[in-house]
C-alpha cells in the first residue's frame, strides 16, 4: 500500500490483522485507518490501536443510525406482509423450502 493509503473496515472483526495494522500505522507504512469491528468486542481498553492518533474507531455501531433502524423495520414488516400476500421475493429467502 502507498504511505497515503487508509484502511477502512466496517465489515467484520478479523478481516484486518490488528497487530499488523498497528505496526503499519505506527511506522507510517500507511496514513491512517477507520475501524468499526474488532476481533474482541467490546475491544479491551488497552487495545494498542487506541494509543494512535491516525486511526478512528467506533464500537461496532457505525451502522446504527435513525435511517438504518427505520429501513430495517420497514423491510422486515414489508417482507412479512409480502409473505402473507404471496408476493415474497424468493431471492430474499435463504431456506426456500419453507415457501412450498
Predicted feature descriptions by range:
Residues 3-100:
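Rossmann-like dinucleotide-binding domain for NAD(H)/NADP(H)
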Amino acid at each position: 500500500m502507498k504511505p497515503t493509503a487508509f484502511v477502512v473496515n466496517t465489515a467484520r472483526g478479523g478481516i484486518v490483522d490488528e497487530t499488523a495494522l498497528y505496526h503499519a500505522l505506527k511506522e507510517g507504512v500507511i496514513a491512517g485507518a477507520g475501524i468499526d469491528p474488532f476481533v474482541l468486542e467490546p475491544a479491551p481498553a488497552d487495545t494498542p490501536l487506541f494509543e494512535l492518533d491516525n486511526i478512528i474507531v467506533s464500537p461496532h455501531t457505525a451502522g446504527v443510525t435513525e435511517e438504518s433502524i427505520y429501513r430495517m423495520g420497514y423491510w422486515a414488516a414489508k417482507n412479512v406482509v409480502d409473505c402473507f400476500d404471496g408476493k415474497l421475493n424468493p431471492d430474499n429467502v435463504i431456506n426456500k423450502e419453507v415457501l412450498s
